[in-house]
Every structure is written in structure tokens, then in C-alpha cells.
Amino acid sequence: MNIFDHQIKNVDKGNVVAILGAQWGDEGKGKIIDMLSEYSDITCRFNGGANAGHTISVNDKKYALHLLPCGVLYDNNISVLGNGMVIHVKSLMEEIESVGGKLLDRLYLSNKAHILFDIHQIIDSIQETKKLKEGKQIGTTKRGIGPCYSTKASRIGIRLGTLKNFENFKNMYSKLIDHLMDLYNITEYDKEKELNLFYNYHIKLRDRIVDVISFMNTNLENNKKVLIEGANAAMLDIDFGTYPYVTSSCTTVGGVFSGLGIHHKKLNLVVGVVKSYLTRVGCGPFLTELNNDVGQYLREKGHEYGTTTKRPRRCGWLDIPMLLYVKCINSIDMINLTKLDVLSGLEEILLCVNFKNKKTGELLEKGCYPVEEEISEEYEPVYEKFSGWKEDISTCNEFDELPENAKKYILAIEKYLKTPIVWIGVGPNRKNMIVKKNFNLN
């Protein structure tokens, strides 16, 4: 489905499209991003680091991407890593090598993105182990994301642009590592080995490190088609998510502007990716969680194990109040509903349409969401029940080919969100995507 060339006749929204996760991540953003990357000129990441990830299949070959945007798989596409990211350069180089080809020639790295060092990962593990002993673990990926954003916020981090002048980088590196070793009582760390690696990165990457703000805005002025790829998802946002069980970056639409340096009026279309049920990895409130056979059914049939960590994901029913809250923040124009096929075989499907205060019976106000753990404990879900379907829907190519009960479920979600569901994922492969042809875009 090609937004950029307006194959949907009643969509003419411009050249800049953002694909954002609308839940706790793992919504299946990779498929729609991959589909649209083929038609874009530039694909961008604006936030996070190697804590995100998806597996993409192109020409029967699978690629596991954690830092690079999906556009790297297409020779006509330029890939950009924005200033809002934290980049573990060793992981980036390994990923570049795994993709192969002349990828470096079409990759641009922001000079303002921060470098994530191995010591950040060590600190992440130290902090998480301490929290585990205290019973307060967050459930991080231990990829060093939080500690790197911490050094950024503390104004002692090192930006990629520094790597262009290696002598300057070496001095800043020594000061940072010595400070962190002292602060966290780390007695052994091979600085010389890491510095040698970074000298090689300096040689290979110095011409790829640019002022991405200027680069992006010049390309926008030239009407290039830009696809912006969100990492993680809205409910993991550092400000708007279920704090403190969140990631360390801005995962919502505001992060697009601060993480790439583009003007908010340049963004034309926001696509929210929504899984047909709900999952989350790690700790934190989950009001529709299913700790029963249905939850296990969803986990196994949906292969709900983390791309990055391989941890089993917690599973539950779709949460409409959450999506309304996320829609308010992100101004979502369209929805890609994923993994509808996983619901096939269930006798009954529940849809959370509101939350009720356990004591007062008062319903949650529209657009609000109990993101704080202590407040969420005061609420219980209000469900609408739907009959399930037994049919295998993976061969469905049109909306009208879906079982009636599946269509009722989709239309109910649209009704509550007042947002068109344009793409419907009905299987694991790229071809297993229904595109609804008739919808209204407000």
C-alpha cells in the first residue's frame, strides 16, 4: 500500500509519514514500515537505540534490525539516524555488516546523537540487579539505554559529532569513562580496547556523520518522500507512559520533531499501529492482562516473545481507553491493526471499552488513562463481548472476505476510536495484509 503515490484515492496528505506504536511496543510495526519503505526516498529513526527491534523478510531473506530503519533494505532509499537516538556503535557496525551491500553510502548519522558505550550497558545491569533485590525492577533490556540518556541529560555524554575529531573524542572519552567507573565502583574496564575500536569507527563513519537537521530540511524542500519510523511505543514514553515502567526517550509524535529537527508542520500523516490484542514486556500495570489459558493461547499462537530479549510477553485484551489517550497525544490519522489472525479460534473476544472505579463505580473520563500504578489499581475494566470465529483468515485479501464476527470486532474498534483502520494484518508474511479501500479520513 503506497501512501506516497496516493494509491488510496482519497488520501493526499503530503510526503512525510510517521509510523508510531500505539501500545507498549511489539505491535508489529515492521511490516507496514517495510511496505512503505519501498516507496519512500528517506527512512528515519528519531528515538531510542538497540532496545527496539523487528525482523523483516525481503526476497525470502530475514533481517533482524535494532538500530537501522527498514529503508536500508532498499537500494534506492536513504537511511537516517536522528539526534534523539542513543547509538551503540559496535552494534550499529555489526548490523550494517549483516545487511551488506553499499549501505554506508546511503546512511546518515546525526552529529547530535549520543554514543552509547559498553559501560552504559554495565551500569544498566548494575541498576536493574539492585532494583530486583529491592523488588522495584523495571524490566529493562539491559542495553544501556537509560544510563546513556542519563549521561546526556547530565550534560556529560558524548555526541557522534565528536568522533570526527579523534583526539578530541579520546580526551572526552577518558573523562567520561573514569567518571562512570568511579561513580558506579566499576574496577575493571578495558578502555584501550574500546578506544581502538572507536578509532576504526572514526575512519569508517566520519563522512557519514552530518548535520541531520540541515540534511532533512533540505530534502523536505526538495519534496522527498520521508518515512519516519518510531521505536518502542506511546505507552512507553518517558512522559506519557506508565511511569516508571517506561523507556528513556520520547516515543510519541513530539519525539519526531525533537529527534529529527524537522518542523511540526512538515509532518503530513500519522499512522498508529495497534495489535488486535494487548501485550507488554517487563513490569508495570496491565489492567486487561490475562493470567489464564486465553493469555497463554495468545502468547503461543502470536509468538509473543521479545525480539530483543526473547522474554515472554504478558498478554491481554485490547484496551480502547489506552488508544483514545494515545490518539489525543499523537493525533493519529489512520490505524494499522495487526495480528488479527491470532484471535482466530477463540470462542469469545473481549474488548475493554472503559474503566470503572472499584469503589465509586465512576467511569474514566474520555481521553484520560490511569498511567500511575497506584491509581491504576483503583480501576477495573468494563468489557464489551464479541463472538469469535474459527476460520483461517490468513488467505483473506479483502475486508469483505473476513468472517462476519471479525468484521464486527474491527468496526467496533473504529467506532470507539473514530479513526479509520486502513491496514489489517491477517498473517505473518508481507502479503498477509488487507487494505481497506473505503474509509473516511477527517
Curated annotation (Swiss-Prot):
GTP binds at residues 25-31, 53-55, 62, 307, 313, 339-341, 425-427. Keywords: Cytoplasm, GTP-binding, Ligase, Magnesium, Metal-binding, Nucleotide-binding, Purine biosynthesis. The keyword Transit peptide does not apply. Binds 1 Mg(2+) ion per subunit. Pathway: Purine metabolism; AMP biosynthesis via de novo pathway; AMP from IMP: step 1/2. GO terms for cellular component: cytoplasm. Pfam families: Adenylsucc_synt. Optimum pH is 6.8-7.5. It is found in: Cytoplasm. IMP binds at D26, E27, G28, K29, N51, A52, G53, H54, T141, R155, N232, T247, R311. It catalyses: IMP + L-aspartate + GTP = N(6)-(1,2-dicarboxyethyl)-AMP + GDP + phosphate + 2 H(+). Its cofactor is Mg(2+). HAMAP family: Adenylosucc_synth. Plays an important role in the salvage pathway for purine nucleotide biosynthesis. Catalyzes the first committed step in the biosynthesis of AMP from IMP. Parasitic protozoa lack the de novo purine biosynthesis pathway and rely exclusively on the salvage pathway for their purine nucleotide requirements. PANTHER family: ADENYLOSUCCINATE SYNTHETASE. This is Adenylosuccinate synthetase. It comes from Plasmodium falciparum. The gene is Adss.
